Amino acid sequence: MNDNKVSPDQALHDLTLVMLYLTRFKDRKKTFLQGEPPFRAWKSYDWDTLDKLCEEELIIDRHGNKSLYLTDEGVEKAKHILDILRIRDWEE
């Protein structure tokens, strides 16, 4: 067995974060809360994985909303994973 492989749980975690990042959009509201991240994504992923990403402060989930916020740390980690997977960002 290859020891460099990650567990299915870790893969789900990392790939969900990447998918949230790649499908992000800017909130059109002009009334951002102080320090609120500008990027949002739709919450159509595994709930347990989203809860874990929220616990790790990679996303902010305002319960009752259909979308969530990507934190600066979440954006940076997603970019790092994109680099590892050799996936080009939209901005490149």
Spell out what each predicted region is.
Residues 54-65:
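A short, conserved structural fragment
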Residues 66-71:
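Minor-groove-contacting beta-hairpin "wing" of winged helix-turn-helix DNA-binding domains
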Residues 1-29:
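Short alpha-helical segments that sit at the start of domains
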Residues 73-92:
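Short, amphipathic alpha-helical interaction segments positioned at domain boundaries
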Residues 23-44:
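Short acidic, hydrophobic short linear motifs in intrinsically disordered regions
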Residues 19, 51, 79:
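A cross-family signal for key residues in well-ordered alpha-helices
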Residues 38-56:
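Short amphipathic alpha-helical interaction segments
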